[in-house]
């Protein structure tokens, strides 16, 4: 029988499944909507396996905090449209909450419990109702023995969910609310500037050597004496560290201060010494090579059957 576009749309609205899957389901069930819904549910696992090869570079980053610990997770989907889906957002929230009971490592979170199943299994099951390849990609956590771990979401679509998530750990015995407020400002800074490391000692030596090699080559081309070249390289490396090290960077909230100096100022409000002990920045789809899709071609393919 001929399957109308309106029938396909109705089934897609009901289930959130993909267009081609809806058309196949209706063809298999002679256009019976209820039977087609059941058919799609029955094929949920098979569909998840079939879709697993498709690139999931969209999705959401979620954060969750409890006491002196916070976590950030990334869950991918194939389209930004699905990232605005309530069911998908609920899934990311559940995964973030489940992550709080682990050490935050990607492996531990993948095996954490969500409604009686692992995070990996739960994400796979969601394919049947959401209609796209869904995948838990990565996670991280920060903890302090005393103090706070502030969180920040950039480009938020809902509370604790967005395209970029940041955690900043502040160790202090002072006022937690004041520490969290400052920590959030630092997290906003991290989101905007994307520092490479907390301190100069934390910078990857290989990255520093690469920069130094470039500076040496540039300095040699100047034709200046070796003693001048050496000072030029020292100056450029100093500037390099100022640009990539969080504590040495000009604070976005107040560029007249470095982040380290801003922390000293914040101690007055916090009421005790404070130390930034770590940060994590997770940007959605970072490092994923995204496929180019042609929606018009998808519609045309569906129309041809």
From Swiss-Prot:
Residues 79-82 are annotated as: Involved in Mg(2+) ion dislocation from EF-Tu. Signal peptide: none annotated. InterPro entries: EF-Ts_dimer_sf, Transl_elong_EFTs/EF1B, Transl_elong_EFTs/EF1B_dimer, Transl_elong_Ts_CS, UBA-like_sf. Keywords: Cytoplasm, Elongation factor, Protein biosynthesis. The keyword Protein biosynthesis applies. It is found in: Cytoplasm. GO terms for molecular function: translation elongation factor activity. It holds the Pfam family EF_TS. GO terms for cellular component: cytoplasm. NCBIfam families: tsf (TIGR00116). Associates with the EF-Tu.GDP complex and induces the exchange of GDP to GTP. It remains bound to the aminoacyl-tRNA.EF-Tu.GTP complex up to the GTP hydrolysis stage on the ribosome. Belongs to the EF-Ts family. PANTHER family: ELONGATION FACTOR TS (PTHR11741), ELONGATION FACTOR TS, MITOCHONDRIAL (PTHR11741:SF0). This is Elongation factor Ts. It comes from Brucella anthropi (strain ATCC 49188 / DSM 6882 / CCUG 24695 / JCM 21032 / LMG 3331 / NBRC 15819 / NCTC 12168 / Alc 37).
């Amino acid at each position: 029988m001929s399957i109308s576009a309106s029938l396909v749309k109705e089934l897609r609205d009901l289930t959130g499944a993909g267009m081609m899957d809806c058309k196949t389901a209706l063809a298999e069930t002679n256009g019976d909507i209820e039977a087609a819904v059941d058919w799609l549910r029955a094929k949920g696992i098979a569909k998840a396996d079939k879709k697993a090869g498709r690139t999931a570079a969209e999705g959401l980053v979620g954060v969750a905090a409890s006491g002196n610990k916070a976590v950030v997770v990334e869950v991918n989907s194939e389209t930004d449209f699905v990232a605005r889906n309530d069911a998908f957002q609920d899934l990311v929230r559940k995964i973030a909450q489940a992550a709080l009971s682990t050490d935050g490592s990607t492996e531990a979170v993948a095996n954490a419990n969500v409604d009686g199943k692992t995070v990996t299994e739960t994400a796979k099951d969601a394919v049947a109702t959401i209609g796209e390849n869904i995948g838990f990609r990565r996670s991280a956590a920060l903890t302090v023995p005393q103090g706070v771990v502030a969180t920040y979401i950039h480009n938020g679509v809902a509370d604790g969910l967005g395209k970029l998530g940041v955690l900043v750990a502040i160790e202090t015995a002072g006022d937690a609310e004041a520490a969290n407020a400052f920590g959030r400002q630092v997290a906003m800074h991290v989101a905007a500037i994307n520092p490479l490391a907390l301190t100069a000692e934390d910078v990857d030596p290989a990255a520093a050597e690469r920069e130094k090699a470039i500076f040496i080559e540039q300095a040699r081309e100047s034709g200046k004496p070796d003693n001048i070249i050496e000072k030029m390289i020292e100056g450029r490396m100093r500037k390099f560290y100022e640009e990539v090290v969080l504590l040495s960077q000009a604070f976005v909230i107040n560029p007249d201060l470095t982040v380290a100096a801003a922390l000293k100022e914040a101690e007055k409000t916090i009421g005790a010494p404070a130390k930034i002990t770590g940060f994590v920045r997770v940007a959605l789809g970072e490092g994923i090579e995204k496929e180019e899709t042609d929606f018009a071609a998808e519609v045309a393919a569906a129309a041809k059957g």
